[in-house]
Amino acid sequence: MSLARFENLISWARHHGAYIHEQVEVYDDPQYGVSLRVRSSQQSVHLASHSDQLPRQSLPPTACVVSCPFSLSLSYLNALNKFPDLQSHSARFPALLLEVLEPHVIGHFFLVQQYLDADTSHWGPYVRSLPQPEESGKLGTPLYFTDADIAWIRGTDLEIARDQREKTWKSDWERGHRILDASSGWEKWNGKWTWDLYKWAATIFSSRSFISTLIPEEVFRMPVTYGTKSFDDIFPVLFPLLDLPNHSTAAKVTWFTNVQNEPKDLSILVESEIPYGQQIFNNYAPKSNTELMLGYGFCIPGNDEASIAFKPLREELMIIRQRHLACLGSHSGDSKQSIFHVRSTPYTRPPDDTRLPEFRLVEDGCVDALAVLTANRREREYMIQHPSRCPERSLEAVFMGPLSRNILKVMAVLSDKLEEGLHDIISTGQHLG
């Protein structure tokens, strides 16, 4: 494929303060598609299509592969147009849309707006470098599957997740485009906020974004408020250039936030030497094949990460978050639907890990989340009063005290959930032949 659009992307990004290492180039990998690698020959600094005189060298440890200024990021924050370093560079959305839609949905519509703005968009070179709405084969996620493709995921968690995502995204799109079509001053856009464009924008965010918590307070340069929305909400953010490396859980990289020097930016640094000619990967954390296929459009053969999902009610989610902060020091699971990983071999055991061996097969936070979901009234009141009493960290909490019945229930639910998933996979496989 032609890499000209990536040459334009790099030129535009560098003009606005972005950086790409001189030993790094963009190339078209036959297996992975557009990727980054350490220069394999005397070719262009940034594109595997020209020639120059730079020697072949490995990429040393701690080297910065790429960096992107926060001012070049694209998200809901730009649509707000409230922060000097996060401007919209576009017509501001109607106040009603900004008030009633969730941050991630507004971000999706903002990307659609940039696509419709075409050459006049501030992010035009970036948008043109992305897989385009008509390039369904490059997008590759289950929402672009044919009927023949869907037959292969029938009966699996992926089929359920695909159907739920399509339903949710369509609902979000309908709410948003109705507001835009009915808003004064937006008449020329009527009919252009199509489902295909919204699905494309949401897919771009699901497959290439970083989380909003990576943007530090120093970037805002003013008190942080969203009106009726909370900054505790986590939403996706696109960072041009940073989304070029492909994902690998084996990649040893660091995401470095710079707020001391201008431009304030986010960088990807490698932790070990990468020989010339080798692809440079990013690491978005361990993910199951269900998550990878749903969000990115690929899976990893032999991946030991499986996932189980639960959809807690709002009250339950608040209790789960409170307990995870007290027990684990962080939130675990998705913001609306708790998704946790399960492995056939135990996770690495920290020195202070006193969990049952069976509990070490599931990701931190899973057992405690299930404990909340399966608790009776007495047990839930106890959890609220004692958020730091974590059954995942104490054998005493499992077999003694007020939560012993609850933990036995958790083990039963985990077992049933995994057996159900295994049965569905075997059954579907038999029908496929």
Predicted features, each with a name:
Residues S2-Q42, S49-F70, L77-N81, P125-G433:
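Long, positively charged leader/targeting segments at protein N-termini
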Residues L74-R128:
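Eukaryotic helix-linker segments that join adjacent hydrophobic helices
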